[in-house]
Every structure is written in C-alpha cells, then in structure tokens.
C-alpha cells in the first residue's frame, strides 16, 4: 500500500512538472524551402508572424500584404515565415522549388519559406500542432467573408468549429519576442489589419 501510494505521488509530481513546462517556438526546428534545417531558436528576440500559405487560393494575394509588412518592419525585428500547405482544396500542388518561384515572381516574396508540409492531422508538423494548441480556433467573426467561410466549412462538417486546428490557408499566428503565441488570426483577417498589433510588439 505504501509503495503504491508513493508511486502515485511520484507520478503526479512528474505530470505536474511536465504540464508546467513552458514551451516556446524556440523549442522547434523545421525544414526550409531549400531543404535546410531551420532552428527556431535562431529567431530569439524577434517578433514572428507564422502563416500557412497556398498558391492557388482566394487568399493568395495576401502574399502582397505579408511581404509589405516584412519589408517595412524587418529592421525593427519582424520576421514573417510562410509554411506552404496543400491540405485545403489542394491549392498548393507545386514542389518546393515551384512554390518559391511562384512567390518570388508574382509577389516578390523575400521572407523565409519553409518546405511544404501538413498543418493538420497525423502528419502535421509539430510547429502548427503547438501553435493551435496555444491558440485554438475561435471562429471567423461576423464579417461577410467570415460568415461565408463558416457557411462553406459547415456544409462539409457541421462540427468543424469544435476542433482547435487550422481551418484554411493563410491562418496567421503572431508571436512576441519571447517566442510565445499572443494571437491567432483567421484567413479573413488581412495582413494590413495586423499592423497595429505587430507594431505594439516591436
């Protein structure tokens, strides 16, 4: 009985320590569009805007706004990071090389792009699993475009909103200089809409 109680106390203590462990973006690594390992600890002290992207989406023109933000504020500490993904309407069918060329030629993208990966499901990259565990889905808002997105996804799955994961291309996560997620923005929120919140963190 004593041993069982002792083991129970030890297990509870270990669980408490594990649950209290503070995870930041700096604990993760990813593969770049060029196939190189990216250690996110290298971004310590930066404000990060992490976005899942696609080349053939109605939201693809947001690349313009993302690049504008990056150019305007990179010298003050902002880094925009794109994660191409083909999970939503198969709107990112290209190879990593084709994606890079598309972004550069059509939108002049100079901010970092990661290798194409899943952001939901069994094969989701660990960064996005962590991002949406920190900031779960909380709705598209009351704008006309938000209602349109809600209607579209509800037709496919009436319970879609109960899951914390990514709902569509160009979901954005804003992280502070300590690597913590401070806000999540759904695709209907444009890069221009984020500027004041980004500036507040710089």
What are these regions (language model features)?
Residues 11-18:
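Hydrophobic h-region of N-terminal signal peptides that target proteins for export
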Residues 182-202:
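Non-catalytic, surface beta->alpha helical segment in thiol-disulfide oxidoreductase systems
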Residues 46-47, 55-56, 60-84, 103-107:
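Conserved helix-turn-beta segment immediately C-terminal to the redox Cys motif
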Residues 108-188:
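Thiol/selenol-based redox catalytic cores and closely related redox-interacting motifs
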Residues 77-94, 109-121:
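Thiol-based oxidoreductase modules, predominantly thioredoxin-like and allied folds used
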Residues 25-26, 48, 169-171:
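Short loop/turn microsegments at loop-to-beta-strand junctions
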Residues 1-7:
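Bacterial N-terminal signal peptides that target proteins for export
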Residues 19-41:
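N-terminal "domain-start" segment that seeds a small globular fold
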